[in-house]
Amino acid sequence: VPELSRVLVTGGSGFIAGHLILRLLADGYRVRTTVRNINRENDIRATLGRAGAEVDRLDIVAADLTSDGGWDEAVRGCEFVQHVASPFPARQPDNEDEIIIPAREGTLRVLEAASAHRVRRVVITSSFAAIGYSPKPSGQPYDETDWTDTNDPVSPYVKSKTVAERAAWDFAARPGSPEVAVVNPVGVFGPPLDGNLSTSVQIIDALLHGRPPLLPRASFAVVDVRDVADLLIRAMTDPRAAGQRYLAAAGQPVTLPDIAAVLRRRLGAAAAAVPRHQLPDWAVRAAARFAPPLRELSGLLGTPKAVNNSKAITQLGWHPRPIADTVTATADGLLRLSSAVAADR
């Protein structure tokens, strides 16, 4: 088999990036990935190696979205760039520019370097945040033609993803720019590769530990991280994907009580602690005034946001797995991690 081309994946310590690197290596690509801190290199190699990757075809280099250093070397010799890294705040920043500016400037740094090195195509992992946070007529599904209006009252994270993606499309319109394709995932679930859990995976972990004791009827669409990786590769290699954006969702939104029910049905005794009772919407809204974590959830109450995922399926032959399988795989992965941690003690 001829050696396939080299792909740069930004933000190699992240959840989506880790699964994307696994798939690229399994498919025969050479992969280079960036980390903010090169001290993470051994951890990343160990994590990917445990998951079965041939890590000898992986280079790890230091580059940070907030500075110019390292991007030129990172992109050199790569046919494709997968820009996955994005600042995700552990808490809402005091000033929204703390997250908006690095997201936008970081995306432009990657595109400038890709342009300078004649990269063939840059695939950007954006988010449903850039599509679905402005109102639509009730019941109409969100699709790739929709954009969040940053003048609406949206969180700094939502604004950052929208502003960064807009900047990418503006850049792509310039003569001589590489081809650009964008994937916009909804809530990304699936098996964690290490104990550094993404926000969505933390929801499943909390449910397995009996938290919150009463479940808000918050709803969100779900996609499996392995299916996101698959779609990112299709968006990279398929000629039709140039200049296109793709909403990545496995189907219509589910509620926290729906997810809890899947866990109980599929896991049996391992789901003994999963909460059974619901918290009425009015109580969530009242509590949100005092509990910041509930503020994000209170925005997910009421009518679920319908989504239309047909573009990726029909244009690129994408086949996302059923949501119940993703929820189960997430829980199984968490249980394996916790038993591995216990064995190490």
Label each residue range with its predicted role.
Residues N39, G49-E105:
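NAD(P)H-binding glycine-rich loop region in Rossmannoid oxidoreductase-like domains
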Residues L231-L294, I323-R345:
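Mid/C-terminal beta-alpha module of Rossmann-like enzyme folds, strongest
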Residues P175-P178, G190-I203, A235-Y246, A270:
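Glycine/proline-rich active-site loop of Rossmann-fold NAD(P)-dependent oxidoreductases
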Residues D152-V180:
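Active-site Tyr-X1-5-Lys
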Residues H83, P87, P93-Y157:
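Conserved Rossmann-fold NAD(P)-dependent oxidoreductase catalytic core, especially the SDR/UDP-sugar
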Residues Q92-P93, D149-V154, G195, Q202-V223, ...:
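A conserved pocket-lining segment of Rossmann-fold NAD(P)-dependent short-chain dehydrogenase/reductase
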Residues S5-Y29, T34:
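N-terminal Rossmann NAD(P)H-binding glycine-rich loop of SDR-like oxidoreductase domains
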Residues A286-G317:
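Conserved C-terminal active-site "lid" loop/helix of NAD(P)H-dependent oxidoreductases
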